[in-house]
Every structure is written in structure tokens, then in C-alpha cells.
Amino acid sequence: MKKGMITKLLNKSKNKCKIMAKSKCKVLLDNGHGGIINGIYQTAGKRSPVWPDGRQLFEGEFNRAIVNRVSKLLDNKGIDNLILVPELTDVSLGTRVSRANKEYIHDKRCIFLSVHANAGGGTGFEVFTSPGETKSDKHATIYFNEYKKEFPELRARQDITDGDPDKEANYYVLVHTYMPACLMECAFMDTLQNCKMLFSETDRDRFASAIVTAIEKIEKTY
């Protein structure tokens, strides 16, 4: 995708926010990894095994499907939001963070959420923040609780040693963004039962709905 077209897509998303009355927060949505262009996945790795039925999940496709749903639901609820990566190419972490920080410089309402599918042979969902106690921790707890409520069938992976359920990691998008930032790992794409949920359109709707319910609660804290 040409640079001019990317700028138009970003501006279109920004203009969409301007038309609506301002919400208390503006959600910057990061759909991690690349999408699929002409049948070719744009990111090395970041995919499930090929399952016995022949299907294979590409994480970047899943992430975009969830982020697109979340954005539409937020639009319907009048909550400002911006998809940081409208293109299908695999945009670098540095560029993603730069786009987010530029938005925050001009609009201090911004909060950041990166959506992913997990890997490593486990099961369940988890929410990450940067190390230490920050405002992100409160947001992560809200995301965690909504996912736990929506998905009782999924293992709620948590670390309560510091008093809250989020896990901490030095992920680039968490430590280099200026605003409160969380990263959601929805379920494991390399575990068959979890991956079936990641494929499911019904469960994709549930993942998105839980995120939006959490954002509505975060909005009320501003």
C-alpha cells in the first residue's frame, strides 16, 4: 500500500472521530502483525499449525477481525477510536508506537490496546502491561474481569503477586507508548480447542464485545 493511501486511511479514521461528540477517552487500536494480501500472509511465523481439517489460523488476520469489530462497536456507542494500522502490510513496532504517540501528543484522552492471539502450547487468555504500577494496571484489570465473565470456559491466566491479575512484560508497544497501554492475548492459536474459538465468528464477536464492555467501564473512570 502506497504511503499516500495509508495517510488517507489514517485521516479518514481521524475525521470519523471528529464528526462524533468527543468521548472521555480515545481508544488507539493496534492489530498486531500483518494481514493477508493476494492470499499471502505478510508475517513470518505468527500462525497456528495446519489442523487435521486443513485449516490454519494467521494471527494478523484474527487480530484485524477483532479490532475491526471493536472499532465498529465503539463507533455505535460514540466512543472515539482509531485503528493504528489500516494497511495489511506488517508495520514495524516502532511505526505503530510512533503513530500512537503522535495521537497522544495532540489528544491526551488516548489509551492504547494491542490485540493478539497467543502461542506456546498453553490455554486461556491473559492481559499484559508494562512493569511497575501504572494507570494501565487498572485498565488491564477491567479487561481481565470482562474476559473472565464472558469466557468462563477459558483459563484466566494471571499473576496476582502484585495485587492485580495482569501480567507484566517489557513488550515494545507497552514500554514505549506515552499513554496507558494494555496488550490482550485472546487465546492460544497452537492449542486446538482454543484455536477453534479463534476461528469461530461467534466467538470473535464475543472477544470484541468483551473488549468494548471493558472500554465502556474504563470510559466511566475518566
Q: What residue spans do the PLM features occupy?
A:
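Active-site histidine-acidic residue metal-binding/catalytic motifs
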Residues: 6, 10, 14-96
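Loop/turn elements at helix/coil->beta-strand transitions in domains of secreted/extracellular proteins
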Residues: 23-25, 75-82, 106-112, 150-153, ...
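Active-site-adjacent mobile loop/cap segments within catalytic or ligand-binding domains
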Residues: 25-28, 112-114, 118, 160-222
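Solvent-exposed loop/turn segments at secondary-structure junctions
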Residues: 33-36, 81, 87-91, 117-122, ...
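A short, glycine/acidic-enriched catalytic loop
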Residues: 36-58, 118-150
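Soluble non-cytosolic domains of exported or imported proteins
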Residues: 57-65, 90-94, 133-138, 198-206
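Extracytoplasmic/secreted envelope proteins and their assembly/folding machinery
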Residues: 64-67, 71, 94-97, 137-144, ...
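Mature extracellular/periplasmic domains of secretome proteins
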Residues: 93-109, 171-177
